[in-house]
Amino acid sequence: MNKLASLIKSSGYADRVLTDQQLGRILGGSDDRRYGQVKRALQSGALLRVKRGHYVLADEFRKNPVHPYALAQVLVVGSYVSMETALAFHGWIPEAVFTTVSVTPGRKSKEMDHPDFGRFAFIPLALHRSGFLAGVQRHVVSDQAMLVASPLRALMDLVAYRKQKWEGIAWVQNNMRIDQTHLVQIQAKGFSALRGVYMHKSASGFLYGLEKAVRDLKASQRALRNEASS
């Protein structure tokens, strides 16, 4: 085993994203010595650079493989996973998603192809600052923490990004391929949490239309159940 990897594992940091400062505390010694150890570990593939000053051990030295959602929040601090990526995470859309899409608190879009961890996209939206994390939940997957939008928040972020106007529930079911069995799971408090989050009227109008459509779906299901039981 690579010496640096062995030291990191024995320190209990094998499954974490490590900064230069943390590596310095683990390795000790002079700056030149630490630089040499890190350089050799990078060249051997035992250590992988996430971005400048941030590293992870290669999967062979970790308990769990690196999760791209956790890395996304290291690549752009303050971001959260959303849109199609979050919808796929929750099982709301059938398609596989090969880009980790996140919403960023910054003003500029950013895309990057990481040689080890895949493709990432960071998208800014016109949001009121106080509602930036409304409907965003902390998940822990394979001992790695990540912020992921709820299904409703992920859908609404996508709507806001595309500037999609409300055209009826058929757009959600046909264009996004979201089944009504998922839609009726959305609770009233989920809609309430997102009111006032989006700056554009089209997004707010979509949220209002979707909330009414979901209420109608639930009412229809109740009526069918009552009819079947009578």
Regions found by a protein language model. Name each.
Residues 20, 83, 151-152:
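Structural motif detector for alpha-helix initiation sites
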Residues 28, 91, 160-164:
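Hydrophobic/aromatic-lined pockets within catalytic cores
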Residues 29, 123-142:
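Short, structured interface segments that constitute the first stable element of a domain
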Residues 39, 111-113, 145-148:
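A general structural signal for short secondary-structure junctions and capping/turn motifs
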Residues 44, 49-58, 66-132:
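Short gly/ser-rich loop at a beta-strand->alpha-helix junction or flexible surface loop bordering the NTP-binding
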Residues 134-230:
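Hydrophobic alpha-helical interaction segments
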